[in-house]
Amino acid sequence: VKIQTFSIVVGTRACNAKCPFCVSKMTGFEELPKERSINLRNFKKAAMLADRAGTTTVLMTGKGEPTLYPDEVSHYLYLLQDYPFPLIELQTNGLSMGRLAVSHYMGVEKDNNWSQGLSAVHLNNWHTLGLNTIALSVVGTVQQHNAKVYLGDPDADYPPLAATIRYLHQIGFTVRLCVMMMNGGVGSPNWVRRTIEFCREHRVEQLTLRPLRRPHQTSSPDASAYVNRYGLGQDQIRDIRLAVAEIGTPLISLMHGAEVYDVDGQNVCLSDCLTIDPSNGDIRTLIFYSNGRLTHDWQYKGAVLLGGQQ
């Protein structure tokens, strides 16, 4: 059995965004432990399993927003020093990082409440501890689109994406832009081309495009209804895949159907966030919760390998 990614769930359900399609709400919060102390015994077992299964990438993510728990992120990075994972990534909506960027470039001193507890000291420390990549979740590169989805108002104070990217690059991070494709945002080949051009202009190392999806079993009818309304049809997804294949050079096929292309020097990955392929026995992601629970799927509660402390 091979495992592609070792995912670590940081924090609680708390989040500083208002995504109407929240995947965590749809997959549910029942898996989250009530206590936030890390089960070191099971973490060691999970890391050993991932290492022996050939995992090269650790992804710190959350059912909420992981950067609201910077000390917990730091703790996991210290724990990972004992394991030979070469690629360590953090998935985030980027709001707190963007606010730090705005403060930095405007030369305005803000207290930690502005960035909700996150500081430049945290980011530099994470980089020193081996965090390679910041994966920024967005619905595109238009500020009003991101503001409407993540903050609930197109006129809300969403940090300029270009400034966030520049700030993270300045620290030394690799940046991946993770675009959730949807109607009203990036939903056509033309919008995909515009997004690729933005990434090239701002030297974004990696671009991942995923269609908005809902899980087979949902815990949030409202979020699922939003996905039904704004999600792309199969014809739209096909057209985007064909367009990228036409202008790009295929580089590699990843587990569960993801395809990586070079498009005039820009790395572009076409993926699907909830794809399941049990046929080959490989695991797309090994998921560790702080209470020690270890699973291999976000949607299905039966995909459990280790139970956590009750």
Residue ranges and their predicted role:
Residues V1-N42, R52-G54:
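Canonical Radical SAM [4Fe-4S] cluster-binding loop centered on the CxxxCxxC motif
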Residues D277-Q310:
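Radical SAM enzyme core and accessory elements
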Residues C15, S96, G140-T141, M182, ...:
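Short, solvent-exposed loop/turn segments at secondary-structure junctions
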Residues G11, V23-S24, L136-T141, L209-L212:
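Short loop/turn segments at strand-loop or loop-helix junctions that form parts
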Residues K63:
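Conserved strand-to-loop "acid loop" that flanks and positions the catalytic carboxylate
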Residues F43-M60, P70-G184, P189:
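Radical SAM/AdoMet-radical enzyme domain recognition
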Residues E31-K34, Q144-A162, R166-P278:
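Radical SAM enzyme [4Fe-4S]-AdoMet core and its adjacent flexible, acidic
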